[in-house]
From Swiss-Prot:
Name listed for the protein in its UniProt record: Protein CotJA
Pfam families attached to this UniProt entry: CotJA (PF11007)
Gene that specifies this protein: cotJA
Native species: Bacillus subtilis (strain 168)
Function: The cotJ operon proteins affect spore coat composition. They are either required for the normal formation of the inner layers of the coat or are themselves structural components of the coat.
InterPro entries assigned to the protein according to its UniProt record, in alphabetical order: Spore_coat_CotJA
Domain of life: Bacteria
Organism ancestry: Bacteria, Bacillati, Bacillota, Bacilli, Bacillales
Length: 82
């Protein structure tokens, strides 16, 4: 990979577009990388969510929680523009 991006939870790339492709180019595509990719080991005594909150967040450990914000939608994560 020629242009490595620094640590950031949101990465982007530009898909290949052939001059013979009948569709218009997409432009940049965005994707998120989870926080656990950047942890070399799991430290002891990590802070935890309560069991009910962990079910809602999708993880037990607060350091591994990553809020998802849709980069293709304007406004906040719930679709409200403001």
């Amino acid at each position: 990979m020629k242009d490595m991006q620094p640590f950031t939870p949101v990465k982007s790339y530009t898909p290949f577009h052939s001059r013979f492709d009948p569709c218009p180019p997409i432009g940049k595509k965005y994707y998120r990388t989870p926080p656990n990719l950047y942890m070399t080991f799991q430290p002891e005594h990590m802070e935890q969510f309560s069991p009910m909150e962990a079910l809602r967040k999708g993880t037990l450990w607060k350091d591994l929680y990553d809020f998802y914000e849709n980069p293709y939608r304007g406004g906040d994560a719930h679709g409200k523009k403001g």
